Amino acid sequence: MKKTSLLFAASSLSLGLLGLSGCGNNSSVATVADADVNETVILRFAYASNSQPVIDAMNEFGRLVKEKTDGSVQIQYFPDGQLGGERELIELTQSGAVDFTKVSASALESFSKDYSIFSVPYLFNDEEHFFKVMDNEEIMEPIYQSTKDLGFTGLTYYDSGQRSFYMVDGPIHTPEDLKGKKIRVMQSETAIKMVELLGGSPVPMGSDEVYTSLQSNLINGSENNEFVLYTAGHGGVAKYYSYDEHTRVPDIIIMNDAIKEQLTAEQEKAIEEAAKESTVFEIEAFARAIEEEKALAQEEHGVQFNDVDNTPFREAVAPIHDTFKNDPAYKDLYQKIQEQGA
């Protein structure tokens, strides 16, 4: 059992205060425990900073939950990292201080080794392969359930696009261009190993530190989808985006299991359906918005985009694939994913 952090204590207090201010004198608003005597259950959804299509999808989830439960369950949001970064939000969901969060699969690696598979570079042949895997319940349900003993499980995924390198001082064409470069990566052992194999120097850090680190030359570049360029402003200092497309790491919505068990079967089913339907909404919204983001990055920041032959990148990171396909803990899952792309 993890020790309660100071952030958790502070967040619990703020949640209590926010809950009181949100409820006011309306006796129809209740916690799950009071649901048998009151009309509406309020469930709390906290999330870190996100692109607009993802925010819209999370709001659509709340709308669908309210609609499908005839208003008996409603979602209250704590946006933009008010309660902490992704690691803290997972812990808050685990403890029941909040009921839902949405985080990168990479952030879940330290809670379940199964999520590490998504950080394997070039795991998917293309976008079609990615969606085929993510929509396969035989593959995904065991991954979602892999954290059940920790008090939470996955509900659904959101598309977060492909991840490529973007740099301050010039484009990337081959792995040689990364040699000696300090590259920000997510706090993932697999992502760190990937950059090392490509010749770079990985610098693990949270997303909120990247802009100032690029600006101060603490790092030479980073890797992410195109939304960081205009929406997060990174294109103002890192103007070279190179499509090596090394990973497609999904976002995952997780839910506290103790809360789920207090809901009626009908309410639980409604939440599960709403989550899946919000995924369809998010995928469509993300695809539309990414093109707008690229155009704005070019127009407002002068970002240059270049295509890359990723063959030498794939060859360089082959040892990571060897590790996963030979490790007893991963080989069955790895094989199932590869079969979907055959």
Region locations from a protein language model:
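A gly/proline- and charged-residue-enriched helix-loop-helix capping module
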Residues: H129-Y144
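Residues in and immediately flanking transmembrane alpha helices
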Residues: L15-G16, I139, V195
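Bacterial N-terminal signal peptides that target proteins for export
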Residues: M1-A9
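C-terminal motif of bacterial Sec signal peptides marking the signal peptidase cleavage site
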Residues: L18-G22
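Hydrophobic helical h-region of N-terminal Sec-dependent signal peptides
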Residues: A9-L17
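N-terminal secretory/targeting leader peptides
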Residues: G24-E128, T147-A342
